[in-house]
């Protein structure tokens, strides 16, 4: 289960990158449908997540990250595997 610190940092990054209020960034929120991200927003957000958490997210994996929870789970999995 992702730590509260990881979740808080991810929410902060998403809020900054997408210009949305952190209160809207819930685990079930979908980046494109609920948070109005376009493809450029998603690329920039993924790059920021990679830098913040020290993980690499290949394009084929990034395409599967649909919700905030998907992002949390993916990053946690990458950190545990390292």
From Swiss-Prot:
The keyword Disulfide bond does not apply. Keywords: Cytoplasm, Fatty acid biosynthesis, Fatty acid metabolism, Lipid biosynthesis, Lipid metabolism, Phosphopantetheine, Phosphoprotein. The keyword Cytoplasm applies. Pathway: Lipid metabolism; fatty acid biosynthesis. 4'-phosphopantetheine is transferred from CoA to a specific serine of apo-ACP by AcpS. This modification is essential for activity because fatty acids are bound in thioester linkage to the sulfhydryl of the prosthetic group. Transmembrane segments: none annotated. PROSITE patterns: CARRIER, PHOSPHOPANTETHEINE. InterPro entries: ACP, ACP-like_sf, PP-bd_ACP, Ppantetheine_attach_site. Signal peptide: none annotated. Gene3D superfamilies: ACP-like. It is found in: Cytoplasm. Its main location: cytoplasm. GO terms for cellular component: cytoplasm. Residues 4-79 form the Carrier domain. The modification O-(pantetheine 4'-phosphoryl)serine is found at residue 39. GO terms for molecular function: acyl binding; acyl carrier activity. It holds the Pfam family PP-binding. Belongs to the acyl carrier protein (ACP) family. Carrier of the growing fatty acid chain in fatty acid biosynthesis. This is Acyl carrier protein. It comes from Roseiflexus castenholzii (strain DSM 13941 / HLO8).
């Amino acid at each position: 289960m992702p730590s509260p610190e990881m979740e808080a940092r991810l929410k902060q990054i998403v809020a900054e990158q997408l210009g949305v209020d952190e209160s809207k960034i819930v685990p079930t929120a979908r980046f494109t449908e609920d948070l109005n991200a376009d493809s450029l927003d998603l690329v920039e957000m993924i790059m920021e997540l990679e830098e913040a958490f020290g993980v690499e997210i290949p394009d084929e994996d990034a395409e599967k990250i649909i919700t905030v929870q998907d992002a949390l789970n993916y990053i946690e999995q990458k950190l545990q595997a390292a």
